[in-house]
Amino acid sequence: MVRDISEAVQSALIAARNAGQKVRGTTSPNPAVGCAVFDANGIIATGGTEPPGGRHAERVALDQAASINPERLKGASLAVTLEPCNHTGRTGPCDEAIVAAGIAHVYYVHDDPNPQAAGGADYLRAHGVEVNQMDFPVEGLEPWLDSVRYGRVSVTAKFAATLDGFTAAPDGTSQWITGPETRQYVHFDRAMRDAIVVGTGTALADNPSLTARDRDGSLLPNQPRRIVVGTREVPEGNLTRLGYEQYATPEEAFAALYESGARDVLVEGGPTLMHSVFELDVVDRITAYVAPMLFGGGRGLLDGPLVDTIGDAKRYELYDAFSLGEDAVIELCRKDRND
């Protein structure tokens, strides 16, 4: 694993990461990989994984580079967020395409955990390509990696709360705890997910649309599947107008989502659903939007205790933290994710 990264390689890895981020939410069950082809004069082309059945990121970038200037490909370098695949599925092996293009150097971040696709790095080395695995953050791939690791959908629990941990005031009001910058960020985040999950309590109380919208209110190009968990009937409203899927339990919902190709799921439910999901021990990530206000009472994050003593607490580790307007965003991941 290489940690000392040159400026040129770092720029290419950033370009590759950005290319992968742009296609998040459109590629499952395949990973949202990004790729950049570059040489001493800079970035030649970038590419992201196409929807299932389409080209992998490496082929998109190589094809784009060839259309711009095929001569620059010979002896060029390639940065990619996931080890190039070494198998034939709906498309041919990416490692063979890299060798055929005349690429001399490959820099990749994550090993491919899928045994059917792994081995690309070894193939490239055997065919004279210099290959380096880089220590570089690629957040957009993490949910897919979690899904492969655990054999289920990757679950992110999202909530907006006050400093003292309440999601609604004592009278039930909750609009709006967070500011406009945070609310827009949530919509952009939704667009990168395969599905949004709420409980029937939220569906009945809030009449949510569960859409991903741009700043002007228009729908973003990618819309996640809308999932309702619970047995109560959802009345006529936004969800019945837009379309949704309903399952009796979180286990049933997650199993059906995984079987149908979803890999990255966002849970936005109230305290009952959140409690059930945490009890299942399937929450891989938490995104907490914390507003600079106090209620001193009201509706909490969960509808009851998860543990009896501090030694049994469900623990997560800090992944990232930043501000949006007046709010703080705290992102956490499972402590055992790298075990």
Predicted regions and their residues:
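Short, mixed-charge, low-aromatic patches
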Residues: 14-22, 80, 97-102, 138-145, ...
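Zn2+-dependent cytidine deaminase-like catalytic core
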Residues: 37-137, 278
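Enzymes that bind and transform nitrogen-containing heteroaromatic metabolites
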Residues: 1-31, 45-46, 65, 90, ...
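Active-site beta-strand termini and strand-to-loop segments that position acidic
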Residues: 39-40, 149-150, 333-335
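Helix-turn-helix
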Residues: 34
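Short secondary-structure capping/turn micro-motifs that flank functional sites
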Residues: 114-115, 138-141, 205, 273-274
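Proteins enriched for Cys/Gly/acidic motifs involved in redox and nucleic-acid/cofactor modification
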Residues: 25-29, 53-54, 121, 127, ...
